[in-house]
Structure formats: C-alpha cells, structure tokens
C-alpha cells in the first residue's frame, strides 16, 4: 500500500462538517478562528477591499505601470465577489498566534483491509486529524493560489507497508520535543530508542509536516486567507468536501502556468488558452531550421539562468556535501559511543577478575566508570546533532528545492512566451504564403480577362487534312481530360483562399493577445521572484544556517568540556590511588 492509494476524503474527526457559504472556504475567518469556542462558524461575506490578491497584485503592478498589465487589478475587482478569501488577520506575534504541534501518527482502518496514516494536529485548543494526501492537496492549492510565493515543502511520498507496521507494533509516542528539551534521541520524536529506519522516517515526516504548517502560519500572504484556518478546523473533518464545495478552488485552472499570477481566481480566457510547455523545456525553443525564436537571450534571462545554476549548486552542496558527511560523522560517533560502552563493560569485568589485586582492580573500576560517562556524554552529543543539526539540514535541502520550484516556474513561463513567439512566426509565414497565392491568382485572372477582351475568331471549318479517326480521338481525349478536371475539382476542391486568410488572421490576433498576456505575466513574475521572494529566502536561509552552525559549535564545545572533565577526574583518581 502506498501513499498514492490514500483517498483524500478520509479525514478523521467526530465533529460534523460545516460547509462554507457561497462555495468558499471562509469557515472561520482565517487562522484566528481556529481558537474560538466551538459552535456554528460565522461566515463573513467577503468584500473586494479585503481581497488579498488585489492588494498583493497592486504592489507588483506599480513598477510595470507602463505596460499592459495595469488593467489586471480593475478586471479582477469586477469578478471577485466571493471565495475562500477571509478578512486579513490582525497583526500578532508568533507567540500570540501559537504554533502547530503534531501530537502523534496513528494507523486508521477504513474497512475491507484498507488503512491509512493520520497525523493528530494540535493548534491552540483545537485538535484535528489529517492524512498525508490532504497535506499534499493543501500544498497544490496554495501553489496555484500563490504562484509567485515560496510554499514550504512537505516530505516525499513513502511506502506505507513498513510505516504502518512500525506504528501499529510500537507503544511509542510520536511527538516533537519541547523547545526547552535537550532534543536528544531519547525524547526527539519517539519516547524511546530510535534505531529503526521506519521510526526515523516517522520522525522525519512529523518534523517536516509540523514545519510546513508553522511556516505557512508565519506567511502574511497566506494567512490573509482562511485556507489554513479551514485546514486546522475540526469542523472541516472531510477536507475533500471543503475543496469540492468551494467554487473558488474548483474554478482554478489545472495548471499553474495558466493562472493569472496577480489574481489566480480571475483567470481570463487569454490565460486559459496559454500553451503548457513540458517540464524539460529549455529557455530557448528551437525551430526546425535550428534558429531560436528570439535572436539573443536578454540580460535578464541570462541573470535568471545564473541564479538557477547557483541555487542548484547550493542545493547539491548542501545535500551531497554538508548533510551527507555530517550524517556519516553522526553515525561514526554513534558507533564510537557503543564502543565506549562495550569497553566500559570489559573494564568492569576485568576489575572483578582482578579484585584480589587491590589497586589494579580499583584503577580498572575508575577506567570503566570514565568510559561509561564518556559514552553517555557522547550519546547526548549524538542525539543533539541528529535532531538539531542533521534534521534541520535535511529541511534546508527541501526548502532549497522549493525555491528552485519558483525559479523553474519562471523558466517555464519564459518557455511559454517563446512557444507563442514561435507560433506567431509560423502563422505570419503561413499568412504571407496565402497572400502571395492570392496575388498570383489575381494576376492570372487579369491575364485571362485581358486575353479574352482582345477578341478571337473561332474557325468552325473542319480540318481538311485530318482524318475522321484522328479527329474523333482528339475529341474523346479532350473530353476525358475535362471529366478528370471536373472530378478532381468536385472531390478535392480547395477552400476559398480568402476564407483561409481570414482564419489565419484571426489566429494571429488571438496569439498576439496571448503573447501580450504571457509577456506581461513574465515581467511581473520576474520582478517578484527576483526582487522579493529570492532575497527573502536568502535571508531566512542564511539565518537558519547560522543557527545550525552556532548550535553545532555550542554542542561540540559542551561535549569537549564534559569529556575533558571526565578524564581529568580519572587522572586525579589515579594520582590519589
């Protein structure tokens, strides 16, 4: 059984579903509504001034006021009268707003031998259960609603076979430790030893999903809507019902490349007709003649190619470099800890054997205790590095991947624009050929009319030298040719060139409209990702890496001091013996 086999409509909660009015997700008026007393949710009619997409869009339209994008705000304001958007949340600190905690991961059976894993989420005084497929659905919706915003990642899909067995066959409590705890292996996610890969996978999933929700709660753009509040609301037990009853979400295009980036809930026909390039599209689409649709990449395009390369290199260095080798070091220290513990037992047994010797047995006992204490100190270090260093590094790798998704989104929009340029060039070439054919036909008609206008005399006299048989053969030959011409004309009659020209001209106008929309979208997306999203990501990335390295230095320093103290005590004991 895999995560793909999960049904998205299997949320677990005893509370009844309160469908949102107007087909929207304004169940509790944002995240703040989750902490309110239980009862019928108050559905607020959304007015246009509270629409975060309009506010979000206007902040990016201003730099491009000279382009054709300036009308997006007005067009969207006319179409958005309802939806999932809730009034903006009041400004509050992270402590006031609270943090999400996943209390446990449990296996739930739905009959006929089918089962799935649910995660019990605690937020303020509310508890709700969600399954992995619902987290996945939430992220996909957020990517469409906020195509220019970095949406945090969720853990990758895994097989549920061993995953479910590890949960069902264990009495462990799968919770994250408090921030004040030592965060070692014993109290990390499972209250007990963490030696099984299945249990490590559970720890990894819970941490990633917890971080996913908390990062969303810290995102001002996302929290202006009610979608996170609805996801954490126990009244919305069935997340699939919430999605299907929302007219706003149901109206979103299947592909984010066909969404209006300034207002995805207001997708115009021009956006809906945009082509979808393949994921492997190169920045320059080549024609049949080997010539790109644009003569030369712009400086902006070259800059984004460089940024994409740097982010890919950063992700690679982090994953195959720092994270990889730090895991290896952690594993080595874990093995060393076990060796020290075994050595302590060996010295203890040796001390028992030498108990008659007096001084030697005492020294061996001191040495056994020193190795045992060293093993305990090293075990504490391993736990802190595993939880506070390795797992945050793993999360940083996934976050870097989410940042590259934004860059890839911009690259695909660039490829989309080039596809339209290539299509426009092809249609214009076709129109030119049709017009040339029309001109040639007109020239021939003029020559024929001119020739007929000169007047000709028809000789009805029978040729004297021609024999009757020869004349008959010529007559039948001309008749057969005429019959063939009529047959071909009836069977393979071509469309009127004027109709073809009109059709191609209409296609060109439609492509030009789509090209204008695509080019305008690309300008907005480029400015937003380059000037807002990526700099913010870089600042957060640097701060998180700084905290990781600071903790690493702190843990190693504390370990070195404790370890040195152990062996200093051993030397004093030997000197006093």
Curated annotation (Swiss-Prot):
Keywords: Autophagy, Endosome, Lipid-binding, Membrane, Protein transport, Transport. The gene is ATG20. Residues 95-239 form the PX domain. It is a peripheral membrane protein. SUPFAM superfamilies: BAR/IMD domain-like, PX domain. CDD domains: BAR_Atg20p, PX_SNX41_42. This is Autophagy-related protein 20. Residues 57-81 are annotated as: Disordered. One of its GO terms (biological process) is reticulophagy. GO terms for molecular function: phosphatidylinositol-3-phosphate binding. It is found in: Endosome membrane; Preautophagosomal structure membrane. PANTHER family: AUTOPHAGY-RELATED PROTEIN 20 (PTHR46979:SF1), SORTING NEXIN-41 (PTHR46979). Required for cytoplasm to vacuole transport (Cvt), pexophagy and mitophagy. Also involved in endoplasmic reticulum-specific autophagic process and is essential for the survival of cells subjected to severe ER stress. Functions in protein retrieval from the endocytic pathway. Its main location: membrane. Pfam families: PX. The PX domain binds phosphatidylinositol 3-phosphate which is necessary for peripheral membrane localization of ATG20 to the perivacuolar punctate structures. InterPro entries: AH/BAR_dom_sf, PX_dom, PX_dom_sf, PX_Snx41/Atg20, Sorting_Nexin_Autophagy. Signal peptide: none annotated. A 1,2-diacyl-sn-glycero-3-phospho-(1D-myo-inositol-3-phosphate) binds at residues 131, 133, 157, 205. Belongs to the sorting nexin family.
